[in-house]
Amino acid sequence: MTDTTNAPPRRASIPRTVWVLGLVSMFMDVSSEIVHALLPLFLTVTLGTSVAMVGLIDGVAESTASIAKVFSGYVSDRIGKRKPLILLGYGLGALSKPLFALAGSAGLVFGARFIDRIGKGLRGAPRDALVADVTPPEIRGRAYGLRQSLDTVGAFAGPLAAIGLMALLHNNMRAVFAFAIVPGMTAVLLVIVGIEGRSAKPASPPRVPLRIADLRGLDRAFWSVVGIGVMFTMARFSEAFLVLKANADGLPLALAPLVLVVMNLVYSLGAYPAGMLSDAGGAKRPMLLGLASLIAADACLGFGRGLAATFFGIALWGVHMALTQGVLAQLVAEKAPESLRGSAFGVFNLATGLTMLAASVLAGVLWDVAGPPATFMAGGAFAAITLFLLATRRVVPA
């Protein structure tokens, strides 16, 4: 008989559910990015929509997702189950895809985007909570990293698939959108057969995520973060405008998804070093560098001529995303009292979600009225104001 008394402890492995959730995220991202990589040009070229309408559609869609996130985690805790909301969220995402292929007007595209983003907002919080539910605390970092890595694979694969499908289907964007149904339904089937419908009881009774009475307990430092987040969001309008700019500078329709490929490649390569920079020197440095990168990106996109300048600007846009994504959420967590953290995130997501709508609408109107340079000049101006506020206020530890 073997003596195992002194054997080293067995290292915990990432649960099967986390792998399934990662694959679900990957397939849905492939489905969504196939559509998103071409949608701005489908609206303007095929449907003859104004750029202002593109901004309105994207702004409403993204703000809807942000606002839905405020309440989805609470509902998940309230009903005591994660799977129903996860399934509903991914189901709405998959069901929206046929509407893009059938759309004969901007109104139907608007409805499809609204349904798709409601689904994204509903599934995000319960999905992340389920990862925590099934994973031992000592490997949760690895578990979240795995899910995010598979999600990133989808963000690359979707635009690349769109390029291949455009060549195969002779630039028929409706046919490409129809193909996006396949990975979307694959994601839904994986949720149905691969995720257990286990109950999840929080340690304390779930609280409404946004309570007016809690706002009095949030101090000036927190509201400064909200103000900076709002100003930063005004500078961060939809990536649809990057696709439109590249097309205006001569990028062929079939290669339009290359914009998101380049942006996501730079973003993914820079995210880990940016995290190391934040760990080593605090959150302020990467935020300032990210804002400087965004200003430089806007300068290239607003004043540069030709595709080389445009793609350099797109790469800088990816740099700013790598440096800034997650930093503001970190600041919200730091500046809000622990007992009010849920309400603090609710306020922040609500404020930035509504601001995203205003930012994208303004960007679209400026594009139609004064041309692409005005859109990117305005974005650069908001980024410069945000950089000034960060550099001169004691909001973020240096």
Segment roles from a protein language model:
Residues 2-16, 197-228:
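Juxtamembrane intracellular "pre-TM" segments in multi-pass secondary transporters
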Residues 91-104, 292-305:
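C-terminal ends and interior cores of transmembrane alpha-helices
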Residues 78-90, 280-291:
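Cytoplasmic membrane-interface "Motif A"-like loop-to-helix N-cap segments
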Residues 174-192, 374-391:
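Symmetry-related core transmembrane helices of the 12-TM Major Facilitator Superfamily/SLC fold
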Residues 112-153:
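Cytoplasmic helix-loop-helix junction between adjacent transmembrane helices
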Residues 41-46, 157-177, 358-374:
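Transmembrane alpha-helix termini and helix-breaking/packing motifs in multi-pass membrane transporters
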Residues 8-62, 222-259:
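Helix-loop boundary and gating motifs at the non-cytosolic
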Residues 68-80, 166, 270-282, 367:
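Helix-to-loop junctions at the C-terminal end of transmembrane segments
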